[in-house]
Each structure stands twice: as structure tokens, then as C-alpha cells.
Amino acid sequence: MMKIKIIFSYDGSAFLGSATQPHKKGVQDALSGALSHLGIFSPLLMASRTDKGVHASYAVASVECGDYFTNLEYLQKQLNKFSHPFIHIKKIEKVKDDFEVRFDVKSREYRYIFSHASYSPFMASYVHFYPKFDLGKANELLGFFVGKKDLKFFCKSGGDNKTTLREIFIARAYAYKDFSIFHFKANGFLRGQIRLSVASVLKVLEGKMSEKELKEQIEAKKQYNHFLAPPNGLYLSRICY
């Protein structure tokens, strides 16, 4: 037996979340099903979990398989036959037996995409349509998140985290064509953290919440915003080991 690392992307609008679901509608279920067509039945482990409607341009999973799979490019090609159209295998690598796909992660990155173009039902599942805003001000507000923080007021209930302390390496905004993008990089994220963060920044930009209140929520003093930004604009974009 050997252990392989699978790097892949997926369309979150086709699933009820990345983790296995009771009705087999999770990304994990679909990828496990594709592997089973190739005779790989070992448990599939995922590096990150995403909610219903959240996408990934770069996700990672690991699984044990027979060491007779010597041609990993061929395995990738065959696996894509059973994974398309909503999952795409980008690369398969052999890893050491002690590789821990979730706990060996050094950092994760997410991007939240806003479209300022005219509404399109064909794009509605993949961006958050929103009026243009002050990108410089958004960058200033996002900067409040950078550093080691207790983000207990930026997480949904139901997570399995032992602590709400996280270190945010990057929180910034930038423009690309008709899009504005929020980029987050951290040593880990709490359940719903980014969507709560995005919604809180938008509330300040809309004048519905003050900078002082945002800072107090980040400093774990008081929660002013309980609402989450829609999931469709969020993408898991990088996992580093």
C-alpha cells in the first residue's frame, strides 16, 4: 500500500458541502465514489471543510491505495473520468506514510469574489454581485484582522476546534477587471470565519456598523454582527504544507 495526495478543484454549487453527507451529496462522497470505480476503497481524508455553496480552486485530500498504481498521471486521467464535471483532479503525488493531510497544513488561503457587473444568473452561483465600494477603505478595515487574534465572535457554532485563536497572515482587498477580491491567509480558519469577516467589513462600508464596533468584535469584546456573507463568492484557493 502507498499513500497519495490528491490536489483538486470543485464547483461547490453542486454539493451540500465538502464533508461527507447523509445523502451522499458532499464533495468527499463524490470523490470517494470516483475512487471506488478504480478499486480504491480506503477512507478519503480532506485537508479542509467548506460549507454548502463554497468552491475550491485548490483543495487537497489523501487516501491509501495499492502500490501497483505506479503511473500517477494515468491514475489522475482515469479519476477525472469519474469526477467530472463538478470535480477536477489537478495533480496526484505520492507522499510519506506519516503524512497528515489536515494536521500537517502550515497555512490556508481563501478568496472572496465580488462582481460589480450587471447581474447574470449564469454567474450567480460563483460570485457575490455587489455595488462598487471604496477598495482603499476595505483594505484598511481588513488590516484590523491581521495578527494573532481570538476570533470567537467570527465563527459559527458546530465546529470541532479546540481554540478560537488564529493567526491571520494576510487580509487584503484588490481589484481585477469588474471584480473586487478579498484575500485571506492564515494558519487556520474557524467555521464561517471568512463569511462573518466579509459581512462585518461590508456593514462598516455601508455605514451600518462603526470601525470601533468592528475592532471590538475582532478584539473579542462584543459581537455586533451575526450575519454571514453569501457562500457563493467564497473560494478555497491554496493549502500549503
Curated annotation (Swiss-Prot):
GO-annotated biological processes: tRNA pseudouridine synthesis
Keyword set includes tRNA processing: yes
Q: What is its EC number?
A: 5.4.99.12
Q: Which Gene3D superfamilies does this entry report, sorted A to Z?
A: Pseudouridine synthase I, catalytic domain, C-terminal subdomain, Pseudouridine synthase I, catalytic domain, N-terminal subdomain
Q: What class of enzyme is it?
A: isomerase
Query: Which InterPro entries did the record assign?
Result: PsdUridine_synth_cat_dom_sf, PsdUridine_synth_TruA, PsdUridine_synth_TruA_a/b_dom, PsdUridine_synth_TruA_C, TruA/RsuA/RluB/E/F_N
What terms describe the molecular function in GO for this protein? Answer: RNA binding; tRNA pseudouridine(38-40) synthase activity
What positions does the entry give for substrate binding? Answer: 110
- State the Pfam families in the record: PseudoU_synth_1
Q: Where is the active site?
A: 51 (nucleophile)
Q: Which UniProt keywords apply?
A: Isomerase, tRNA processing
Q: Does the keyword tRNA processing apply?
A: yes
Which SUPFAM superfamilies does this entry report, sorted A to Z? Pseudouridine synthase (SSF55120)
The record's catalysed reaction(s) read: uridine(38/39/40) in tRNA = pseudouridine(38/39/40) in tRNA
Q: Which family does it belong to?
A: Belongs to the tRNA pseudouridine synthase TruA family.
Describe the subunit structure.
Answer: Homodimer.
What does this gene product do?
Answer: Formation of pseudouridine at positions 38, 39 and 40 in the anticodon stem and loop of transfer RNAs.
Q: What name does this protein carry?
A: tRNA pseudouridine synthase A
Classification lineage? Bacteria, Pseudomonadati, Campylobacterota, Epsilonproteobacteria, Campylobacterales
